[in-house]
Structure formats: structure tokens, C-alpha cells
Amino acid sequence: MNWKKETVEIKKRRKLAKAQGGEEAIKIQHEKGRLTLRERINILLDKDSFHEQGEIAGGVEVDSDGKLESLTPANFILGFGKINNKQVVVGGEDFTVKGGSPNAAGLRKSVYTEELALKFKVPLIRLHEGGGGSVAGPGKKSGGYGGDPVFSKSRFKSVAETLREIPVASAALGPVAGMPAARFVASHFRVMTKETAQILVAGPAVVERAFGKKMTKEELGGSEIHKLNGVTDNVADSEEDAFLQIKSFLSYLPQNIYELSEKIDCNDPIDRKEEELLSIIPKDRKRSYEMRDIVKLVFDKDSFFEMTKFFGKGIITGFARINGFPVAIFANDSNFYAGSMSAEGAQKTSRFIRLCDTFRIPIVSLVDEPGFLIGPDAERAGTILHGTEAVLATTESKVPWSTIMIRKSFGVAAAAHYGPDGYVLAWPSAESGPLPLEGGVAVAFKKEIASAKNPEAKRKELEEKMAKNQSPFPRAESFSVHEIIDPRETRKYIALWAERIQSQLKASLMNR
């Protein structure tokens, strides 16, 4: 007597589970230009590193003798795997089984995915494609929706806990609604595919029933909608591109809040000087320039990874490396609103700073901040509310900051760019004060300008006079900045700072 019969049964069930929703469902998935979940996992993870959990979970049908006739696998697949030889947990809805809408086993596995990542303190990656609950779900057979037991904990508890302890990255790779959509946004990094993904509170049929308006999934929640409202951080050209972006994001973060991000080998000399930096800021204060070019010239070559580019366009956020050390980049983009902080830009700022604070990633702020965005639209958007929240996020930040005054630094909004006890450098092009010259002079010298024989000439005269007071040299003389530097020296100064703060970062882990 042995257990061969039972092992054959195990093998049979595994084979049925691997078949997912069947050949026809897989064919339809491919015809829509989308991979199956198992294909996605294989592409995302290091080769042969996936160790599935709950492989044969699902609903079964047996004959009168108790022999297995069929198995409908759980429409959620999860397990351990490795990315660049580092352990992660990955999970996602299997759209080939019931369109990814959770069956009983799938629901349990989806919750367990977060608990597993939390237990082992490793990054969590979600690959979303599926709907939420269905009116044809559990209540259809039981005659009603009894709900969860009174002692059950909220499914959102583990969702919230993951965000406090481990990196969470989510990809939307098809239509995503209900609880999967909520999980998608409850992530540190969110990416959706350009043409195949939609994030929806409710689909077209529900919207038409409620509003009498016919709309496609793409019109309701495609990437063109959500890249502008901040629901997704980034948009990917393909599923493979989405996986590469997730890998890039995770490369800057530690495994959990109890570790620090890793330094990598760097062949880019810290004393590299780029002549272009000497002329990159126009002498004409009203002209814009490319802040991203500064980032690329100062930090390690090809190391900049941008997040949330199309939401809050006046603000730039992302990660880079300096001499191999990972740092966060927080900057202004003078091409949009002259770099001023809008309500959306402030929301983007707050979220990004808190992400860096959670995982102890030092922040480099490149400042060209004329102040909060003004005007009726800005007031309606609650700019002062969200802007103040951004300032408070900076004030409460516990990571090391280095602030480089590139050009403007004005108003309350400027306070969002200077972390506690930060290392402050200024370029010769820097200017700072309570208000920008253009508005400040017009207000402070209103009567004097109006009574002048040539008001325009008087205004220009006053602006030139006041500009000297906003120069960085008086600040350097009074030790209000650590150094005023040649822009070409920026890389070296920041690289030396990044090395100095490592002991500070290690000590901060003791307070966890």
C-alpha cells in the first residue's frame, strides 16, 4: 500500500488548475491583446523563481463515487518569486475565469496575498485585471447576502498595513473595477497599459442605467483619463513595459521599512562637470528651461525614473542615483504654470514625500518655485488647502534633505522644498523672497509707480533694484545657505552629501 493514487490526484488537479479558464477563454484573452496571468507572472519574475501558493484551490465537481469530474480554479493566482534575485510576493486576478470577478477561493487568496507579503516583509506586486463582486455571486444560491461574520476584520486592514511596511506596486492590465480598482490605487506605484487597461468605479452598463448615457470603458476610465487625474502614476506602452517600470521602481526601494535601499556600483565619476549647466538657466527670468535636463546632467547617467508625470505638471517627482546611492527627486517644471504649485501638484508632492519618508529615501529638491498657483480656478481647486498639506508633509519629514536653489523660491509654497535641517545649496541664478518681483513690486510700490512720469520705466527701475536683494549672495554672506556653488559642481556636492547621510539613515532605522 502506498499513496500513489493520491499523488496522481494531485497531479491531475494541478493540470486542471494550470488550464485556467480553458483554451477558448485563453484564446479570447490573446485576441484582445492581453496576456494571461500566468504568462504575466513568468515575464515579470526571474526565470523559474515562481513558487505558487494554493495552486489547486478552487471549486470541484465529483461523480456519485466521489471521483473528480472537474475543477474550476480560484480566479486569483499568488505566490513568491524573485526580481533581480530579491524575494517578492505577486498576485492577481485571472480574467480567463469568470472575468476575474472573485469566486470563493479567489477571494480568500486575494486577501492572503497581502498577509503573506506582510508576514515575510517583502514587496507586494499586484497584476490587476478583473471586476469586483457580482449580484449573481453568493447571494444567488443562498437567497440573500448574509455578509461576513461579525468578528471578521475589514479586507482593507491588510491593504492599509502593507502601505505602512512594504513597497506595493500595482499594474492595471485590462478592465479593473470594484475591489481590484481600490487595491490598484492603494499602492505606492501604479502603472496601467495604454490601450488595454481601464480603471472603473462602475462599468458602461451601470453608468448607462444610472445616467442614460452610453460610454465605452476607455471613455470612462482609460489611461488618457487617469494619467491626468493621478489615479495612475505612469502609463505603459505594453504589458512588458509595465513590468519593466515596476522593476525600476522597486530597484530604488528597500525590501521593507526595516531596511535601507541598496547602493549599486557606479562608474560615473562624482567630479564629472557638465558645461551645459553653466548656461541652462536663461538670464531672462521669464524664459523657461528643461529641469529634467538638469536632473540628467547632475545625477548618475540613465538613472532617473519619473513618477506621475502628467498629474500636477508643475511638479516633477521620481527617483535617481548619485554615485550609486538612491535618492528621491522633487523639482519644479517651469514649462507649466512657470513651475508654480497647483492643487494637483501639491497633492502629488504630499504623497511623494510621505512615500520617501516611509522608506527612508533621502530627498533632493531642485527649486524653481514662484509660489502657489493663483487665480479663480486655483481658488476653486482648494490650492491653499492642498498646498499647506504639502508644506506640512515636508515639515514632518524625517529623511535627510538637500535643497538646491535653481531659480525662484517664493511664498508659502517655497517652504515645501526645504526639509528640516536640510543641506541647502544655491546656484548664482537663485532668487528668493516673500513674493516674486513681478507681483511684489507692483503691490508694494503701487502709488509710487502710478505717480511717476513714466510708470513702466519706474516699475522696471524698482524691479532691478529689488532684484539685487533677492540675489543668493546676501544669503550666502549671512550663512542662510550652506554654499553658493558653480552649477557644474552640483554633482560633486550632492554625491558627498549622499555619502555623509548614510550613517544618519542607518540610525533612523533604530527608531522604527
Where are these regions (language model features)?
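Ligand-binding clefts of soluble mixed alpha/beta catalytic domains
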Residues: 1-512
